[in-house]
Amino acid sequence: MSSLSLRAPAKINLHLEVLGLRDDGFHELAMVMQTLDLADELAVDSAPAGELSLSCSDPQLPVDGSNLIVKAAEALRRHCGRPELSAQLSLTKRIPIGAGLAGGSSDGATALLLLNRYWDLQLSAAELHNLAAQLGSDVAFCLQGGTQLCFGRGERLEAIAVAAKPAVLLIKNPNVSVSTPWAYGLCKERLGSGYLSSEADFERQRQALRQSPLLAWLKAEQQQLPPLRNDLQQVVAPENASVQKGLALLASAGDPLQVAMSGSGPSLFALYRDQPAAAAAQSALAPALAENGFEHWICQSTAERHG
């Protein structure tokens, strides 16, 4: 079969609420995730029978069995009992690594979609979702994209029919990293006394999010975007001067709708009603962002993953 390629879009968290601890040790979450048009690109070409290989435009990214692209390919072969299937995969990396933007998860989800097509496996959406959920907490969302309520570890999805599609000014200091396990551990240490423990309590919070002002704004049922909640930001920002500085910079120019950290960070974003407003803010902030070591991108939120 001739070569194929698919885009692997980034995401941001418009809401990240840590509800409590699950029996399996993971945190129970209530989130709103949003796909952006910033994307990696994954291509596949033929290879000798049984051979899987991955190359990447960014030499910092591991291309061995620890990479979710390779894990996804191997999971597909196991699921179908087809060890002879082969692929030469190449990734063009545009999403910053380790940034809280689900770049790795999106790459893994895209590998599932791409290889399902390339190998003509004809797996159903449900089968792909189950494989995605096994690969990682954000992979199931990245498989579908758009704007979604995400519950459980992030694998339980409810699509939101949104009217608002804000522009996004995204910033990240490439010299700063945040360990996701560390962030969740700190959250448990600092906020754990308020954790919920019963399924009834979890469901009450899920329902509150479904009926929240944020959802009303996304559906254009109210004009004012409320402050965005990220429980990990509450604990990470006080420990990270770069995150604090970035949030302050984003809030200082262009009258953003709201500013927040994405996921466990360290990526930060500001929302604007349209691209011209985001571009004006980027222009105004560019000197200060450069002075403080931040890379920056203007992105658009999208209604679907646009594979």
From Swiss-Prot:
The gene is ispE. Keywords: ATP-binding, Isoprene biosynthesis, Kinase, Nucleotide-binding, Transferase. The keyword Chloroplast does not apply. The active site is at residues 11, 138. It comes from the Bacteria. HAMAP family: IspE. Belongs to the GHMP kinase family. IspE subfamily. It holds the Pfam family GHMP_kinases_C. Pathway: Isoprenoid biosynthesis; isopentenyl diphosphate biosynthesis via DXP pathway; isopentenyl diphosphate from 1-deoxy-D-xylulose 5-phosphate: step 3/6. ATP binds at residues 96-106. One of its GO terms (molecular function) is 4-(cytidine 5'-diphospho)-2-C-methyl-D-erythritol kinase activity. Its EC number is 2.7.1.148. PANTHER family: 4-DIPHOSPHOCYTIDYL-2-C-METHYL-D-ERYTHRITOL KINASE, CHLOROPLASTIC (PTHR43527:SF2). This is 4-diphosphocytidyl-2-C-methyl-D-erythritol kinase. One of its GO terms (biological process) is terpenoid biosynthetic process. Catalyzes the phosphorylation of the position 2 hydroxy group of 4-diphosphocytidyl-2C-methyl-D-erythritol. It comes from Synechococcus sp. (strain RCC307). It catalyses: 4-CDP-2-C-methyl-D-erythritol + ATP = 4-CDP-2-C-methyl-D-erythritol 2-phosphate + ADP + H(+). NCBIfam families: ispE.
